[in-house]
Amino acid sequence: MAVPFLSSSLQLTPTSPILFTKVTPTPIIHNHRSTCTIPTKPRLRLLRRSAVAGTAVSDQTEGGGDVLLNPEEEKRVEVADYDWTEEWYPLYLTKNVPEDAPLGLTVYDRQIVLYKDGEGTLRCYEDRCPHRLAKLSEGQLIDGRLECLYHGWQFEGEGKCVKIPQLPASAKIPKAACVKTYEVKDSQGVVWVWMSTKTPPNPEKLPWFENFARPGFFDISTTHELPYDHSILLENLMDPAHVPISHDRTDFTAKREDAQPLVFEVTERSNRGFAGTWGREKEGGKGSNLLRFDAPCVLQNNREFEGKDGVKNYFSGLFLCRPTGQGKSMLIVRFGVTKRSPLVSVLPQWFWHQNACKVFEQDMGFLSSQNEVLMKEKVPTKDLYLNLKSSDTWVAEYRKWMDKVGHGMPYHFGHRTISLPKVPPVVEHAPAGLIAALSASYPAKGGIGTMHAPNLANRYFRHIIHCRSCSNVIKSFELWKNILSATAVALTALAILVVSRQWKAVLLGSAALCSAAAYTCLRAINLNTNNFIRTHRRL
C-alpha cells in the first residue's frame, strides 16, 4: 500500500554504496512440480533449474511474453552470506515510547521489552524474567528499574538483577539472575535494535536518511500494526500501480482514470538491496521518481522538485517495516518535505493519521488473503504471480533479493526459492492456546475483556495505542463530549423551569448548540477509531 499522496512524488537521495558480500555455493531451489523445498548440490543445480525453466517460460509467455516479466532471465540463483540477526530493525518512534511503563515488542518471533530508565536512557531486554519466565513487559518501572510484577525482581542497566524481595538479607543475588540485553539506538526520531547477541553492533548498517537531516525538513510520522507478513507489506509499499485503483479518491492524487502503464529502470542491485527509477508512460516514462530498498526492511521513495521561486525542494516517503512474526508486521511511515503545503499546516495531525489508517484498511483484505494463499500453496512467487513489466518490476526485484538472502532468515518466500517456518503460525502465536496468547499480548496484559482484547483488524489496536498524540486527542474529544452533553441536559432542564419565553428560547438554543458540538466530538472519536468500510458501486 503506497499512500496516495506519496505515490505520485517519489524519489531517491544519494546514499553510500552497497557492498557485495561473499557468495555461498548452495542455494535452495524449489521445484514447482512439488510442494517441498529441495536442497540441491552445486553440480545438480543447473539441471534442476533448467527443468523448472522450460515449463515456466512456455506456460507464462504464451500470449503474453511481451508484457510479462521474464521469470527466467537469470541462469542461476545467487546466494549471499546473510544473518537476519546482524541487522538494525526499527522498533518505535522515539516520541511515542512510554515514559512510565515498559513496552513489549517483537522482531520475528523474538519477544523484547523496551523502556526508559531513570536517566531517560533507552534499555532493551529479552521479554522474559529469568525467575519463572513471566513477561517483563507486564511489569512496572520503579526508580528507573524494570520490575517483574510476578515476584518483584528488579533489573537495571545491562540486565543486572538488583533486587529479589524473597532473598534473605545476607544472601547475594545469583549471577544467573540477569536478563539478555539488546543494543538500541535513537536515530533521527526512531528507535532501532540490533538483534544479534553474538556479533557487536555494526554502526555502518544503521540507516541514515539525508533528507530528514536537511534544515527545515517537516514530516508526519505514524505507526501501524498490520495483520500480514512484512514481505507482503513491502511488496505493497513498492507497488505504485495499485494506488489509482485501490485508493481511488482517497485524496486528490489518486484517481482510477489515471491508472496506466509505468516505466521502470533498475539502476542498482546488490546483496543489500536494490534501487531504481520509475515514471508514467504518458509522461514519457521519465524516471523522476526514485525508489531504494535497503536490507532488511527499509524502503525509500524520494523526489526532488523545483518550486516557483526556483528553490530546489525535497520530498521523502520513508517506510520502516518490522517483521513481528508470521502473518504480522509493524510499519513506521514518515512523509517529509522541505516545503510544507498550506493544507498540512491548517489540518490537525490526527486528520492525516486517520487518513493513513484508511489507506491501510483499503488494502487490508487483499494483503491478508494474499498472505493466506502463500502459506497454503508453499511455492515460490514465480509459480503464483503474473508480474507485468509495466507494473510489477519492484515486486519481482524484491522477491529475487529474497532468493539471495532468504536462507539467512527465519523463513522466506522468494521468486524461485522458499524456506518454510519451523512451526505453524498458530503454534508460534498461541502455543498454549488462543486465550493464553491474547492474555499475554500487548496491550491486554492479562485482561481479555471486549475493551482490551487486541484485534489487529481494529484501527484502535493497529494505530491509536501506538500513537501518543492520537490517544491524547481521543481523550480530549471524549472529555469535551461528556462536558457538552451534560451542559446540554442542564440547559434543557433549566429551560423547562424558567417562565420567560425569551429565556426558554435562549436556553434551548444553547442546549442545541452544545448537543451539536457533543455530536461533532463523537464523530471525531469515531473517525479516529472506526475502520473504513469500502462501498462498492457500479461504474
Swiss-Prot record:
Cofactor: how and how many bound: Binds 1 [2Fe-2S] cluster per subunit.
Description of what induces expression: Up-regulated by light.
Gene3D superfamilies: Naphthalene 1,2-dioxygenase Alpha Subunit, Chain A, domain 1, Rieske [2Fe-2S] iron-sulphur domain
InterPro entries per the UniProt record, alphabetical: Cholesterol_7-desaturase, PaO, Rieske_2Fe-2S, Rieske_2Fe-2S_sf
UniProt: Fe cation binding residues: H242, H247
Tissue-by-tissue expression: Highly expressed in green tissues and very low levels in non-photosynthetic tissues such as roots and etiolated seedlings.
Ranges of the Stromal topological domain: 51-482, 528-539
An example Gene Ontology biological process: protein targeting to chloroplast
Chain location of the short sequence motif Redox-active motif per the record: 467-470
Record's subcellular location: Plastid, Chloroplast inner membrane
Cofactor: [2Fe-2S] cluster
Domain Rieske residue range list: 88-193
Presence of the UniProt keyword Metal-binding in the record: yes
One GO location term (cellular component): chloroplast inner membrane
Signal peptide: none
GO MF annotations, alphabetized: 2 iron, 2 sulfur cluster binding; chlorophyllide a oxygenase activity; metal ion binding
Keywords: 2Fe-2S, Acetylation, Chloroplast, Iron, Iron-sulfur, Membrane, Metal-binding, Plastid, Plastid inner membrane, Protein transport, Transit peptide, Transmembrane, Transmembrane helix, Transport
Coiled-coil residue spans: none
Topology, Chloroplast intermembrane side: 501-504
Residue numbers of N-acetylalanine PTMs: A51
Subunit composition and interactions: Part of the Tic complex. Interacts with TIC62 and TIC110.
Protein role: Involved in protein precursor import into chloroplasts. Part of the redox regulon consisting of TIC32, TIC 55 and TIC62.
Protein name per UniProt: Protein TIC 55, chloroplastic
Organism encoding this protein: Arabidopsis thaliana
Lineage: Eukaryota, Viridiplantae, Streptophyta, Embryophyta, Tracheophyta
